[in-house]
Amino acid sequence: MGLPWYRVHTVVLNDPGRLLSVHIMHTALVAGWAGSMALYELAVFDPSDPVLDPMWRQGMFVIPFMTRLGITNSWGGWSITGGTITNPGIWSYEGVAGAHIVFSGLCFLAAIWHWVYWDLEIFCDERTGKPSLDLPKIFGIHLFLSGVACFGFGAFHVTGLYGPGIWVSDPYGLTGKVQPVNPAWGVEGFDPFVPGGIASHHIAAGTLGILAGLFHLSVRPPQRLYKGLRMGNIETVLSSSIAAVFFAAFVVAGTMWYGSATTPIELFGPTRYQWDQGYFQQEIYRRVSAGLAENQSLSEAWSKIPEKLAFYDYIGNNPAKGGLFRAGSMDNGDGIAVGWLGHPIFRDKDGRELFVRRMPTFFETFPVVLVDGDGIVRADVPFRRAESKYSVEQVGVTVEFYGGELNGVSYSDPATVKKYARRAQLGEIFELDRATLKSDGVFRSSPRGWFTFGHASFALLFFFGHIWHGARTLFRDVFAGIDPDLDAQVEFGAFQKLGDPTTRRQVV
């Protein structure tokens, strides 16, 4: 037929059997990729340290999605929350991966069957004997079935009525686990960080989908609407389907980047806004202040800060610090976190406590500035030593660590103080192993960043696809060259351009 590459899909335009076949094959490819990717990730994933080397630091992409739906155990004998297990059951990570691969194989065979046996009676219009699809009826069937699936997920899987529940955690990502969730029917259900909204919205949307599906199955569209929206044209289906997909992609790009109950930080890593707003830093200081109010020493109060909470308060876990073209996991960037060194508290020679100004997200380098409790600059690491007034040496800055591995250790040597001041710009200070993975020291993004970039990019492309195919189906007659005001009988093949008498073909 000699079709150019960008028009090859026209071969299934008027062939319902093979149109179905290629869609089944597409499902086979997607399910096959998901299962294979899961097995690959499980092969390289190290579950030994869920606190300092969680899945998102290791660049896992499909494991977090399985985990948020209730999968936590592996046939390898480990659990995502740490520790060992003896009976993971069939629905382990490997079980889900295997199910996708088996499903992919079945879809592959079904696609071949439908390609070979394309001329089925079900696709034939009994009035004309030609292949035809009742698209409004098919729309009703799909709407009804997707409504049933949506309702079932919300009413059974999420609530734990028949299923494990979903991943639920506290606002600081410390106590996450899989548990049943009750639907939130009040106004709180509209809070994107309330897990109950996931159950209630799926139940509500599923109910609406079931009712809408039944409506479209029992009520035919008016003729004027049918013709106006080109409901008999398969390209209308393509256009509206692309619209649904790009809209969903934009929504999930937002819920991933800004955070929500569907994207827990324990599975996907913190958001950039938690660094920008000092979210974890405030909670750490609140806990320390509460400890001091209970007559604990500084050392005791800081020692009670969970290492997991301190690790979130480190700029290397900010997904906006990775460049778009820096491949690899976060561990390939700044290294594998080994331990928290503790919280450094800086003081000048007058005993004033100094705070290192933290690096904003979009800076690669930032001046080291130490301010007092009133925000007045008291010390810095100068660019030009000759003009310095506030250098660490001149001000006599010392540093002492509280909590962590260096608890109780203090330094007054200016070179060492400056080293830790530079590191304090980046949040809490951790010992990082850069040798194991040959990490290059350049920050990487987390799966949260990759997911957002991918879905936002494809949503934009699909938006243009929706406009393109929508215009093609709505203005098909215009693009074909038919004058809408043409009253004369048009004979196909009489003219080179349809309906244009100036291009009459010569009879040979």
From Swiss-Prot:
| Primary subcellular site in the record, as a coarse category | plastid
Q: Which keywords appear in this protein's UniProt record, sorted alphabetically?
A: Chlorophyll, Chloroplast, Chromophore, Membrane, Photosynthesis, Photosystem II, Plastid, Thylakoid, Transmembrane, Transmembrane helix
The regions listed as transmembrane in this protein's record are 21-36, 101-115, 140-156, 203-218, 237-252, 457-472
Alphabetized GO MF terms: chlorophyll binding; electron transporter, transferring electrons within the cyclic electron transport pathway of photosynthesis activity
Annotated InterPro entries: PS_antenna-like, PS_II_antenna-like_sf, PSII_PsbB
Q: What biological processes does GO assign it?
A: photosynthetic electron transport in photosystem II
How does the UniProt record describe the way this protein sits in the membrane?
A: Multi-pass membrane protein
| SUPFAM superfamilies per UniProt | Photosystem II antenna protein-like (SSF161077)
Query: What detail does the entry give on cofactor binding?
Result: Binds multiple chlorophylls. PSII binds additional chlorophylls, carotenoids and specific lipids.
One GO CC term on file: chloroplast thylakoid membrane
Entry's localization field: Plastid, Chloroplast thylakoid membrane
Q: Which family does it belong to?
A: Belongs to the PsbB/PsbC family. PsbB subfamily.
Q: Which NCBIfam families does the record cross-reference, listed alphabetically?
A: PS_II_CP47
- Give the protein's biological function: One of the components of the core complex of photosystem II (PSII). It binds chlorophyll and helps catalyze the primary light-induced photochemical processes of PSII. PSII is a light-driven water:plastoquinone oxidoreductase, using light energy to abstract electrons from H(2)O, generating O(2) and a proton gradient subsequently used for ATP formation.
Which HAMAP family does the record match to this protein? PSII_PsbB_CP47 (MF_01495)
- Its protein name is Photosystem II CP47 reaction center protein
